[in-house]
């Protein structure tokens, strides 16, 4: 297990800190499950217990006992499969056992609604930030950059001062899944906020390029949960004013969804949106086009052809008073 995390995930796969934490949590939950449901203490757990039936039961337990969503279940499943595919090479004598576990399929669920904020919703949330305090100015800069860049929360928290180019063309370099780098253009207004933030926090010095761009009170990089806390704080305030604009549940990822939807609604090509978001395939980006009913309606209206068939001014049944009264009585 130690080699899997330190050698394979970190050195060979180049997994992000977010991925490593997610995998770590998966195995912590697995140990909890074995201890609670199989009555085996952690020090007595052996590889012989790692069977397909045990893993499937564990995934079911996540849903039933921990109230995990299907998406979370599938993330845990992916972590397990990654580890046991690794074990095929590390322990080939039990190859069939590891292959069985690796064959577990992700669970299909109902097509969930893609939550995103309208432009008014984003504005309302940002308006709740108190820019009279240094913490508030940090929060506004962070949230504006999160939205404008379409970054994942893990990409945001891993930013350093040197990730930002404050000269034209304004860009931020994000490190995404698999340590893949992508350069995303940033609006001038947002970059002005970033530059002011750097100056106020004495970060506009070349010697501080490796410092975290957004940190907590101890100078450590802000965590994903820290960003989520900030967002939920302002979302709660905004929800009181206009509950119809702010979903009951909100996470940092909603800024990414919102940015993609707003670009799409503005007529930006899906291929360009794909590059901003760092998707491997444009098929992944197409979820935004499928989610926007307004765009579907506009497309149908644009494709409408008048076939010359029109509704008569007076319906045939309206000519017959008795028939009309009869039909109305059915209601």
Task: Label each region the model flagged.
Residues 1-331:
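Conserved catalytic core of the tyrosine transesterase superfamily
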């Amino acid at each position: 297990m130690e080699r899997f995390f330190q050698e394979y995930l970190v050195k060979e796969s180049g997994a992000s800190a977010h991925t490593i934490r997610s995998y770590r949590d998966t195995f912590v939950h697995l140990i909890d499950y074995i201890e609670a449901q199989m009555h085996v203490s952690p020090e007595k757990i052996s590889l012989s217990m790692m069977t397909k039936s045990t893993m499937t039961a564990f995934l079911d337990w996540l849903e039933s006992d921990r109230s995990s969503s299907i998406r979370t279940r599938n993330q845990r499943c992916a972590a397990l499969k990654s580890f046991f595919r690794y074990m095929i090479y590390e322990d080939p004598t039990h190859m069939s056992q590891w292959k069985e576990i690796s064959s577990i399929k992700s669970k299909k669920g109902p097509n969930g609604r893609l939550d995103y904020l309208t432009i008014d919703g984003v504005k309302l949330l940002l308006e709740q930030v108190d820019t009279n305090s240094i913490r508030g100015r940090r929060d506004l800069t962070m949230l504006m950059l999160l939205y404008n860049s379409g970054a994942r929360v893990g990409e945001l928290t891993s930013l350093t001062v040197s990730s930002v180019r404050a000269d034209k063309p304004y860009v931020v370099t994000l490190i995404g899944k698999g340590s893949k780098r992508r350069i995303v253009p940033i609006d001038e207004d947002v970059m002005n906020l970033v530059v002011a933030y750097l100056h106020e926090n004495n970060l506009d010095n070349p010697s501080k390029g490796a410092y975290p761009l957004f940190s907590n009170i101890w100078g450590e990089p802000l965590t994903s949960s820290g960003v989520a806390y900030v967002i939920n704080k302002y979302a709660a305030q905004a929800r009181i004013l206009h509950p119809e604009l702010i979903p009951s549940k909100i996470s940092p990822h909603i800024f990414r969804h919102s940015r993609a939807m707003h670009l799409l609604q503005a007529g930006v090509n899906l291929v360009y949106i794909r590059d901003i978001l760092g998707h491997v395939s444009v098929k992944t980006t197409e979820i935004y086009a499928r989610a926007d009913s307004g765009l579907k309606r506009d497309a149908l209206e644009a494709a409408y052809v008048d076939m010359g068939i029109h509704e008569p001014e007076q319906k045939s049944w309206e000519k017959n008073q008795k028939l009309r009264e009869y039909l109305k009585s059915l209601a």
